Amino acid sequence: LPVLKSGLWEVVVQNQKEPAPPPVKVLQCVDKQTSTLMLISPFSGQEGCRAPKVRKAGGGYSVQMNCAVHGVKMVTQAQLKGDFSSRYTGSFETLIASTEIAQPPAQRFEGQWLGACKPGMKPGDLELPNRITINLKEKAVANAKHDHDHDHSAPGHKH
């Protein structure tokens, strides 16, 4: 994947369901080390995902993520385009291998570089619309540790 320009990015995610709910805006503090994590964050919020498969396609990038959450397989297909230094756009769709879970609608997203990260933000920080900040880099490390601490297929496994 391309490397996002370091600094503060505003990412707007729009659900493609009709009628469409209001878009969700998040702020991301990005550096070279967190670029990939932040770039795929709109469509990679699950545990149990393999490393994304990335290929160049149609003047941009095609990304596929395979995940398994509590035995349910999910495949997310995403497309990304842009210069990745001032702006990028993308879309994604997740297919869930279950008849008991509703298929989520397709989503579109757009990232725009705003400048330097806000004071107090560190690379990997994602500021949600409710002003809560989570650090995706720390979350990824914690999820990796969690995945190795116990067997997700064990009977009665819960989060």
Regions found by a protein language model. Name each.
Residues 11-14, 62-69, 90-98:
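Short beta-strand segments that buttress and anchor functional surface loops
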Residues 143-159:
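Histidine-centered metal-binding segments
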Residues 1-7:
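N-terminal helix-cap/turn-to-beta initiation motif at the start of protein domains
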Residues 26-28, 51-53, 75-82, 92-96, ...:
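Hydrophobic/aromatic beta-strand elements that line small-molecule binding cavities or substrate pockets
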Residues 35-79:
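Mid-chain, structured segments of secreted extracytoplasmic proteins
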Residues 11-48, 131-136:
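Short, solvent-exposed loop/hinge segments that bridge or flank secondary-structure elements
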Residues 16-20, 69-74, 96-103, 117:
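Short, cysteine-centered beta-strand-loop-beta hairpins and adjacent loop/turn segments enriched
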Residues 99-143:
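Edge beta-strand at a domain terminus
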